[in-house]
């Protein structure tokens, strides 16, 4: 058998195993082979891209990644991958990897040595510790985020750290906190296998979470009856599979949720026993808080009664028939209903409110706490949950769901970190928009952030209204931008100092996905040139601060903040790159971090358990036989070890009585509505081929060719009125900025008249020059889904 | 050379399905496995990854093909 025949036979075995599983819903009789060639070494890793958390098998040979396969043993994806996943290995091999530190001199970035680069970072910190910030990411590994968190909260004690996940899921966090008193979904992906009805709230999983979506499509292919409802503002690929597509006007989602609640109450189809046993009612206050103000059931019913089908039709554009259909479904006890959402509900000036209301519909109707009955938010980044929400790398957060504003939480964190009492600052740092606004404001005019160290993200393209929040800083004296990244992104190219980073399987790592699943992988290949782990960069800076006398870099016993030790408990100088992999730094940081996880019952297992598994969903609790058991369905007796009092127990209840909160929030108009000057609404989003701002996927030739540039979708009637043809370049303009890009008529997505959709993956077409930075008052998450724009044919050059 | 493992999910219309199976069987780039209900294991062999992507897109466009899942891809790095 020659090499080609060998590869073909193993590929056919893989495909046959997957076909069997798809067809019969069972594991294949024989596991697919793990190797396709004798000299390829295989190991597991979670995919580098979205928050689904698919596992891949990574094949390496000669120090290179040479093959990728879906991981048959992974519960998340069961051997399947999406178009991005099966190309993830090529993410490492773009032609322009950053391989040396670069310093801007006379306007140009020139190579320098690591020693000099680290000294420059340290000089900036020491010059003004209070004005130094780290801007991180849901793409940080858990140990990377934890190290940055410890440096800022436990070392510099200025709390100036926030992640790009503020831009993608902060409203989901505040929604969970205000409803259940603790963050992250109760359900998991198993719900997708058990639900009778799946409602996508402004969500397009066919493109954004395609492997999860394939679980739904596969169930149908096996003959399962599954009703898929697409609540959407434009026709998408998800619409093509939906049993019912219900279009609504942007910002109309609050009215829809309230309208469903009103009909449940009016028809008496709400779940009285569940509500009376497990829920309290809350309403909005001024100023807004996560606790709100108590209201009685009668007050709640009265407030909801305003959302009649006729009023919902007026506010949301949803017909009374469609609203009645939704209320009928939620009113049935014989169905299991899962709601899914992501950016549509989160990137919203009423993001917390709509999150609360969707949880409320599930609670009011009792569609909670049984497999298939779950309100579940999805995330867009591979470790938005693991690194941001669980490690707490937000400006107010501490690991494990603790917060800097509570004295008892600071005391607990100081205990875990062995810090002197009072080290942790009780004042939260700046959230993302505020951090960048202050960085782009002159120092003598309130711009008190003068250095930002960006790790693993691209704010020059992902911040809203970048001409206001990002670019002014680049012309202000005294402002200094440090960027750690793998490619010369737009942010890196605008930086004063660039640090080349290792990525994905070039380093050890851990991620946490959308269903509370913590995942681990080992370094498999070396990073190129002088690229180095972000975690090492953080520890190396901390050590130089220590050596130059910064008092925050020592614990209360005088030991270095990152006291990494060998098996004999002797410190290992891991700040020296040559020694970094002498021990497993990830494992030691994780073991320290997981002590925090018990406070909010987000228990994590020892690092070694994750080495063995394709991820484990927290809380993971040790059993009498010393095995470790994960939790699929949180707050549910019989599965969640902490739910012991009743069938359902919300044991972190805001009201301290084991009850969740059902909220009333009124519909409110968006911050910007179309008018005569700017008559259309812009929605931004994503496409299946690309991820985030495209800095990785646009360097994978297959993905770049499949979707080479951004475009704008408009309705054919609007195109006719504007006199533009398919493919013609138009100018989209808002009160903040404008971009030129081609029109795509009747393309993949189809907005209704008056609306425009533009994906944000293309660094060369900066749609965030156009978007606005208004944000949800509680989550501080901006609204990228609606702003007023006008479109015109591009003027001749 | 690129070798990819695919699962082609067919729709259940018998006439279109037979037609699609015949088309797939005639394509020299494809090796077909035994169908399991609606799911057909397929190995695609192409000169380069771009041709593989084009092939998958072409398969997806066939009227009797509901979807194509790519399970693994063997590629070479320059």
Language-model features and meaning:
Chain A
Residues 135-141, 314-318, 342-349, 380-381, ...:
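Conserved short loop/turn motifs at secondary-structure junctions
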Residues 146-229, 254-258, 359-493, 502-509, ...:
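Extended redox/cofactor-interaction regions of prokaryotic respiratory oxidoreductases
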Residues 117-132, 188-196, 303, 324-338, ...:
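Glycine-rich phosphate/diphosphate-binding loops that line cofactor/substrate pockets in enzymes
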Residues 240-248, 517-528, 699:
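Short beta-alpha connecting loops at secondary-structure transitions
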Residues 503-524, 530, 750-753:
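Catalytic or ion-translocation cores adjacent to nucleophile or general acid/base/metal-coordination motifs
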Residues 1-269, 277, 281, 292, ...:
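N-terminal export/assembly segments and adjacent metallocofactor-ligating motifs
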């Amino acid at each position: 058998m020659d090499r080609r025949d060998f590869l073909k036979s193993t590929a056919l075995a893989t495909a046959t195993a997957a076909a069997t599983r798809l067809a019969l819903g069972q594991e294949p009789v024989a596991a697919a082979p793990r190797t396709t060639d004798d000299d390829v070494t295989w190991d597991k890793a979670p995919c580098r891209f979205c928050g689904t958390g698919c596992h891949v098998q990574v094949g390496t040979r000669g120090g290179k990644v040479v093959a990728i396969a879906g991981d048959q043993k992974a519960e998340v994806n069961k051997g399947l991958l999406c178009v991005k996943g099966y190309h993830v290995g090529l993410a490492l091999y773009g032609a322009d990897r950053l391989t040396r530190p670069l310093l801007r001199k006379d306007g140009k970035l020139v190579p320098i040595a690591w020693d000099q680069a680290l000294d420059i970072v340290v000089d900036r910190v020491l010059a003004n510790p209070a004005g130094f910030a780290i801007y991180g990411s849901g793409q940080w590994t858990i140990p990377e985020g934890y190290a940055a968190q410890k440096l800022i909260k436990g070392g510099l004690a200025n709390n100036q750290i926030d992640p790009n996940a503020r831009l993608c899921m902060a409203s989901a966090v505040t929604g969970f906190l205000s409803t259940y008193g603790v963050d992250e979904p109760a359900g998991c992906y198993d719900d997708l296998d058990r639900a009778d009805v799946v409602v996508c709230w402004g969500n397009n999983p066919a493109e954004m979470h395609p492997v999860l979506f394939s679980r739904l499509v596969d169930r149908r292919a096996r003959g399962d009856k599954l009703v898929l409802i697409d609540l959407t503002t434009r026709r998408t690929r998800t619409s093509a599979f939906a049993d019912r597509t219900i279009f609504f006007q942007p910002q109309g989602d609050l009215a829809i949720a309230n309208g469903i609640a009103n009909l449940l109450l009016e028809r008496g189809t709400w779940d009285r026993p569940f509500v009376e046993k497990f829920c309290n009612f809350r309403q909005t206050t001024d100023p807004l808080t996560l606790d709100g103000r108590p209201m009685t059931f009668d007050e709640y019913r009265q407030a909801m009664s305003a959302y009649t089908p006729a009023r919902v039709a007026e506010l949301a554009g949803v017909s009374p028939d469609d609203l009645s259909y939704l209320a009928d479904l939620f009113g049935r006890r014989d169905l299991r209903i899962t709601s899914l959402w992501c950016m549509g509900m989160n990137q919203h000036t009423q993001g917390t409110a709509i999150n609360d209301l969707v949880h409320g519909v599930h609670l009011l109707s009792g569609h909670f706490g049984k497999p298939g009955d779950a309100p579940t938010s999805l995330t867009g980044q591979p470790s938005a949950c693991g690194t941001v929400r669980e490690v707490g790398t937000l400006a107010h957060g501490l690991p494990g769901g603790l917060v800097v504003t509570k004295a008892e939480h600071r005391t607990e964190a100081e205990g875990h970190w062995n810090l002197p009492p009072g080290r942790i600052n009780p004042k939260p740092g700046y959230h993302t928009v505020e951090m960048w606004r202050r960085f782009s404001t002159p120092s003598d005019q309130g711009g008190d952030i003068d250095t930002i160290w960006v790790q693993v993200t691209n704010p020059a393209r992902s911040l809203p209204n970048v001409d206001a929040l990002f670019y002014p800083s680049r012309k202000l004296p005294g402002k200094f931008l440090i960027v750690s990244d793998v490619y010369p992104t737009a942010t890196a190219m605008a930086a004063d100092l660039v640090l080349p980073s290792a990525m994905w399987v070039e380093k050890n790592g851990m991620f946490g996905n959308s269903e509370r699943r913590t995942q681990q992988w080992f370094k498999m290949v070396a990073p190129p040139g002088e690229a180095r782990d972000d975690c090492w960069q953080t520890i190396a800076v901390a050590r130089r601060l220590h050596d130059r006398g910064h008092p925050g870099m020592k614990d209360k016993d005088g030991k270095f903040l990152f006291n990494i030790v060998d098996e004999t408990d002797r410190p290992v100088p891991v700040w020296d790159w040559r020694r970094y992999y002498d021990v497993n730094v990830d494992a030691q940081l994780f073991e320290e971090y997981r002590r925090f996880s018990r406070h909010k019952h987000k228990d994590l297992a020892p690092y070694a358990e994750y080495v063995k598994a394709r991820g484990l969903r927290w809380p993971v609790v040790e059993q009498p036989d010393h095995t470790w058991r994960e939790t699929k369905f949180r707050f549910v007796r019989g599965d969640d070890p902490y739910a012991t009092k009743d069938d359902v127990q919300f044991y972190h209840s805001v009201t301290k009585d084991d009850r969740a909160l059902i909220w009333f929030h009124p519909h409110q108009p968006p911050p910007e509505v179309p008018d005569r000057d700017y008559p259309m609404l812009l929605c931004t989003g994503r496409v299946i081929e690309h991820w985030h701002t495209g800095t990785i996927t646009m360097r994978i030739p297959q993905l770049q060719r499949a979707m080479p540039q951004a475009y704008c979708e408009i309705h054919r009637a609007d195109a006719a009125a504007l006199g533009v043809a398919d493919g013609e370049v138009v100018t989209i303009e808002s009160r903040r900025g404008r971009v030129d890009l081609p029109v795509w008529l009747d393309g993949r997505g189809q907005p209704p008249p008056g609306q425009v959709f533009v994906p944000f993956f293309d660094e060369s077409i900066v749609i965030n020059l156009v978007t606005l930075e208004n944000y949800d008052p509680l989550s501080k998450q901006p609204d990228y889904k609606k702003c007023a724009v006008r479109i015109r044919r591009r003027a001749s050059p | 050379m690129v070798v990819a493992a695919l699962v082609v999910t067919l729709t259940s219309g018998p006439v279109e399905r037979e037609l699609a199976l015949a088309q797939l069987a005639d394509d020299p780039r494809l090796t077909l496995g035994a169908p399991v209900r609606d799911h057909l294991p397929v190995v695609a062999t192409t000169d380069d990854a771009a041709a593989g992507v084009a092939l998958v897109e072409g398969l997806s466009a066939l009227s009797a093909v509901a979807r194509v899942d790519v399970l693994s891809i063997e590629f070479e790095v320059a």
